[in-house]
Amino acid sequence: MRVVIQRVTEASVSIRGALHSRIGQGVLILVGIEDRDGESDIELLTSKISNLRIFDDSEGVMNLSVKDINGEALVVSQFTLMGSTRKGNRPSYIKASRPEIAIPLYESFCNSLSAKLGKAVRQGVFGADMQVALVNDGPVTILIDTHNKE
């Protein structure tokens, strides 16, 4: 499972020109799922995301988590995160899970993160053509791949 975490002052998802979800200060999380992902990946990521210290404290040091600041989360599924550019110029998405595998994992991810944050998590719509708008604060952008731990 791969996630891109972006610290934002605001973010939103629109579908066919209509606003679907919006958050204020918090994190926008793009999620890519592959067949070998499971509940252990979800637990690792949602624990890490909810406690990741990427928000400034009163001294201007990144020492606070989204939970500490009572921030919001917007989660968007993005199969293109699983793209491979190893061969040729067109990305291959063969590693991305099919919807019947990915949707339950995506929903579990959102539920787990919501429980850890103690509040509802806003979401995109799985498989929809979405327009994602954000104001990246910093910018701060973190990539985590559960199968390539660093």
UniProtKB/Swiss-Prot annotation:
A motif (Gly-cisPro motif, important for rejection of L-amino acids) lies at residues 138-139. It is found in: Cytoplasm. It comes from the Bacteria. Signal peptide: none annotated. Its main location: cytoplasm. Keywords: Cytoplasm, Hydrolase, RNA-binding, tRNA-binding. One of its GO terms (cellular component) is cytoplasm. It catalyses: glycyl-tRNA(Ala) + H2O = tRNA(Ala) + glycine + H(+); a D-aminoacyl-tRNA + H2O = a tRNA + a D-alpha-amino acid + H(+). GO terms for biological process: D-amino acid catabolic process. One of its GO terms (molecular function) is tRNA binding. Its EC number is 3.1.1.96. A Gly-cisPro motif from one monomer fits into the active site of the other monomer to allow specific chiral rejection of L-amino acids. An aminoacyl-tRNA editing enzyme that deacylates mischarged D-aminoacyl-tRNAs. Also deacylates mischarged glycyl-tRNA(Ala), protecting cells against glycine mischarging by AlaRS. Acts via tRNA-based rather than protein-based catalysis; rejects L-amino acids rather than detecting D-amino acids in the active site. By recycling D-aminoacyl-tRNA to D-amino acids and free tRNA molecules, this enzyme counteracts the toxicity associated with the formation of D-aminoacyl-tRNA entities in vivo and helps enforce protein L-homochirality. Belongs to the DTD family. Homodimer. NCBIfam families: D-aminoacyl-tRNA deacylase. This is D-aminoacyl-tRNA deacylase. It comes from Porphyromonas gingivalis (strain ATCC BAA-308 / W83).
